[in-house]
UniProtKB/Swiss-Prot annotation:
GO cellular component, one term: cytoplasm
Protein name per UniProt: Elongation factor G
Family per record: Belongs to the TRAFAC class translation factor GTPase superfamily. Classic translation factor GTPase family. EF-G/EF-2 subfamily.
GO terms, biological process: ribosome disassembly
Amino acid sequence: MARDLKFTRNIGIAAHIDAGKTTTTERILYYAGVNHKIGEVHEGGATMDWMAQEQERGITITSAATTVGWKYRDNQYHVNIIDTPGHVDFTVEVNRSLRVLDGLVFLFSAVDGVEPQSETNWRLANNYKVARLGFVNKMDRSGADFLNVCKQVKEMLGSNAVPLQLPIGSEDNFQGVVDLVNNRAIVWNEADKGMTFTEVPIPADMVDETLEYREKLLEAVADYDETLMEKFFEDPNSISETEILTALRKAVLDMKIVPMLCGSSFKNKGVQTMLDYVMELLPSPLDKDDLVGINPDTDKEVVRKPVETDPFCALAFKIATDPFVGRLCFVRSYSGLLESGSYVYNTRSGNKERISRIFQMHANKQNQIDRLHCGDIGAVVGFKDIKTGDTLCDEKNKIILESMVFPEPVIGYAIEPKTQADVDKMGVAIAKLVEEDPTLHVHTDQETGQTILRGMGELHLEIIIDRMRREFKVEINQGAPQVAYKESLTKSTEHREVFKKQSGGRGKFADIVFELSPREDDKLGLEFENKIVGGVIPKEFIPSIQKGFEEAMKNGVIAGFPVESMKVRLNHGSFHDVDSDALSFELAARQGFKEAAKNAGAKIMEPIMSVEVVTPEEYTGPVTGDLNRRRGMMKGMDSKMGAQVIKADVPLSELFGYVTDLRTISSGRATASLTFSHYEFVPANLAETIVAKVKGTAVSK
């Protein structure tokens, strides 16, 4: 029998690093009866942090998925939960999770409030239009301030944050919450690790505050739902609990209100009420808009409804390698039904592939199931050719869904196998890791022959190299971190390239005339415009010319850095009946690019990081002075909870070892967060140094 989708929730848990995401998920597993003991992150025992590297470092690296049941108002809910990383180096995991989720629980630390990665993840959630509620965690910590965090969410994230609860006590005295929707107070029983809770009278010293914030809640709801406005002005108390919840749910789905809750996951308080509000307020797959895609055969829009009677359609959002079952593909099903043993069509590869097994995931463990229902999240085995972002569908009812866009890597390491025995193993390891992680790139330096591994940050690449050693038993040497510089064209130029080779027998010949210029839009890659008329170059050679330019972009003309974007307009050319072939035209394009780019004003670009430093006031001078020495561009300064928050844009090349240096400058009291911001042109004097370093020559003074 088909499951009622009204009672399905696909939710994520997201936040800045150390806000308590994994601890919260562990409590959910415990209270939902999935785990019979609580796994603690600080002890390396969290179920959801299953990788050795996660348990050692106490951080989440991959998005772990799990499924739980939750009873609310006599209905049994089916909840798929994805616990995502908070560290900036693993934003890709947040990105691909948000693409397939319907709702989000966004955690904030009651002490630290809105932090840099909170802002990044919040923007990603806005991009994917994911409805959310806020959970202010760590109310037991010194300096906890629920209402101040609500204010920050409103001001810094530009959202309509509305408290649904008030904390009873804080810091060591945090006991429970007052629920403003139903006007009741709840305290948790510590004897059974918060498994049970008791309703108590609202504390006398909180009655006035409760009235004030309940009125604010009613006003926010009445503002959204005009039918309640008259009631609000006549008698706010005449608005029933059902009316509040109905209007609140609509406002949350419409992304007009972010309900704010509070608790302490570590102290086992507030998690069950948060889960109840997930069921009450966050969307089911039925609440989302119908899915619109493109039929690849007709190029026309097609619509899929979240019903099992519609043709099957799903998105592959993650690939992982499991030591026991092999390649696992995580999918979100949007319509239809997927049964074990059935065939699906991949619209990218054009292949029909058999699904051998389907699993419901619980961290790194699998529970085999017979079918994946519409609106569900699961993992499947059986694909020979699958990539993150692929659309899977019924072959007779094809559809392509919008894929995912991932950020470009900004840092690289040169790596090499330690022994001859490690050569093949390294190749296998890299192939599997690149397949899993769209932000991990690998290429071979043509000058040195070295393998360059590129990723989102030092921690990202450290984890990758550690996984190569542990999972694939590869011993490797690694070089110092390298900045992922790029080259960019700044002006247009026209060029003719004649490629001719004659060495007895059939020769090689290709003649192309093209204009090379910067792209006018902000997209990456090659924009190729074919203006050939009259068959002066046969159309079967045009794809080879385009391929030649795409290959040439991988190595720029200044220092061999990749050219991130450019436009080529192919205007004219000629061919030879016997000597011209596809390879001749591809080589003509490659050679032509090298010559033309010299006249197209190529310049080197470097990655710029957005740096946020939180420091005690007495270290403000030394910290800003150090950032200036690192070519930092100051963006502003704020006060936050008795500390100074310094924001600056700083080139990545100046930031290696920065966290260690900052500890020295501030006697260990300042902290920094680094996020990739954008690319900028390198100053001319530094560009000369970079080129000299790459080419191994001295810089002329």
